[in-house]
Curated annotation (Swiss-Prot):
The lineage of its organism: Eukaryota, Fungi, Dikarya, Ascomycota, Saccharomycotina. One of its GO terms (biological process) is flocculation. InterPro entries: Flocculin (IPR001389), PA14/GLEYA (IPR037524), PA14_dom (IPR011658). Residues 1-110 form the PA14 domain. Belongs to the flocculin family. Pfam families: Flocculin, PA14. This is Putative uncharacterized protein YAR062W.
Length: 198
C-alpha cells in the first residue's frame, strides 16, 4: 500500500503496528518509501524502515511496535506499507499518534492521500522542509527595582532542533516592582514562546 501522509502540524509522529501476523514494514519519506510523484514506480530497495515487524515462525506476535518520524506541516510524505501473510489468519492494525496525543487507527481519511504519477508535473520537485530556517521569538517579563518599564531586544542565530540555523529573537521587558501583582506573574518571570517557519 502506498500513499502520501500529510501532517497537520510540525512535530514528531509515531506510527505503530499493534499486532503483526506475519510480517510488515512501514517506510516514511522520499528515498525510503518511494520518490515524489513515483508512487506506482518499481520499489526503492532501501532497508531504512520506519517499522520492521516480523512474527517468528511458531512464535508470538510482536506487540505494539513503532517508529517515530519528525515531519513538517503542509508537506506530503511518501508512505509505504509492505505486508505478507503465511498460513491462515493474518492481521495488521496500523495507527499513528499525532503530536497532540490523538491516535488515528486504520482509517486515515484526511491524513493519507493518493495521486496519479506524473513526473512531468511542475510541482513534483519539492524542497526539503528540514532545510528551512526557523525563527523563534521569546518574550520575558521581569520585575526590577527601577521606576520605569524597560524593553530590550537581542537577536542571535542558534542551531535549531532540526540541526539548521535558527534565528532567535529574545525580548525582555522589565517592569518596576511597584506594579500591581495582578498585572504580572507572581513568579519572577513569565515566558511566552512561539515558533514561525519561514
Amino acid at each position: 500500500m502506498t500513499g502520501y501522509f500529510l501532517p497537520p502540524q510540525t512535530s514528531s509522529y509515531t506510527f505503530r503496528f499493534a499486532k503483526v501476523d506475519d510480517s510488515a514494514i512501514l517506510s516514511v519519506g522520499g528515498n525510503v518509501a518511494f520518490e515524489c510523484c513515483a508512487q506506482e514506480q518499481p520499489p526503492i530497495t532501501s532497508t531504512d524502515f520506519t517499522i520492521n515487524g516480523i512474527k517468528p515462525w511458531q512464535g508470538s506476535l510482536p506487540d505494539n511496535i513503532g517508529g517515530t518520524v519528525y515531519m513538517y506541516a503542509g508537506y506530503y510524505y511518501p508512505l509505504k506499507v509492505v505486508y505478507s501473510n503465511a498460513v491462515s489468519w493474518g492481521t495488521l492494525p496500523i495507527s499513528v499518534e499525532l503530536p497532540d496525543g490523538t491516535t488515528v487507527s486504520d482509517d486515515f481519511e484526511g491524513y493519507v492521500y493518493s495521486f496519479d504519477d506524473d513526473l512531468s508535473q511542475s510541482n513534483c520537485t519539492i524542497p526539503d522542509p528540514s532545510k528551512h530556517t526557523t525563527s523563534i521569538v521569546t518574550t520575558t517579563t521581569e520585575l526590577w527595582t527601577g521606576t520605569f518599564t524597560s524593553t530590550s531586544t537581542e537577536m542571535t542565530t542558534v542551531t535549531g532542533t532540526n540541526g539548521q540555523p535558527t534565528d532567535e529573537t529574545v525580548i525582555v521587558a522589565k517592569a518596576p516592582t511597584t506594579a500591581t501583582s495582578s498585572s504580572l506573574s507572581s513568579s519572577s518571570s513569565e515566558q511566552i514562546t512561539s515558533s514561525i517557519t519561514s
